[in-house]
């Protein structure tokens, strides 16, 4: 193989073959022609590419326009077929001249009765005038100083009170309307306990009777009196009185005479009855003395008994 190649090269580059080669001028001309052909081919290719790019750009622009136009056409069809008929129906429903419904009738009735002028009662007018006069006399500085402004709610409350007062039934002025129940009960008890013929208070004036009939204690006595202590006193009084009565009965039976009833210091058993206002709270010393005296009396009764 190497021998054949070397032989071919020698034949090609031999002297005879070199004479057959073209001249250098013809070679340069061929080069120029080849370059022109290449330039023309490249120019044609570029021109064709530019044409394709332009066509593609126009196509894309037309496609965007077509899409926008398509959206506009769809919106126009929706407005014509959906929006306008629906809006027309709503307008017809609102401005229809058909028979009104219940809500409309109620609204018209309410408007009719609220627009009617109403005349307030004379008592309400008097209260309102009095309130206006007081407000004018005090002036706005009074409310500003107190940090309060004359509000509408206060006026409404006062007018409502006046209306309630006018609507309330007017009861006749009788004893059960004017006199409280506690005073009536106290008066009934006083009448029942009063002895017949002779005055219980032995000529006492009307001032003492009215003073005894007062059903309440003054503030000073109310502060000192305790309910539990009063109940304890009453229970203690009842037990000691029962013991005294039993001892007196035993003593009377032993001696053959009826012993006098021991004088009680309770307000209910006393002949004159101490007034409710003059009642005092028993102290521990008084209770101890009373208990010691009762024990001595009971021992004397048991010692005298056979």
From Swiss-Prot:
Organism: Rattus norvegicus
Protein name, as recorded: Protein FAM228A
InterPro entries referenced in this protein's UniProt entry, alphabetically: FAM228
Key words of the record: Phosphoprotein
Segments of this protein annotated with the region Disordered: 237-277
Transmembrane segment boundaries: none
Family: Belongs to the FAM228 family.
Superkingdom assignment: Eukaryota
The encoding gene: Fam228a
Record PTM Phosphoserine, positions in chain: 270
Lineage: Eukaryota, Metazoa, Chordata, Craniata, Vertebrata
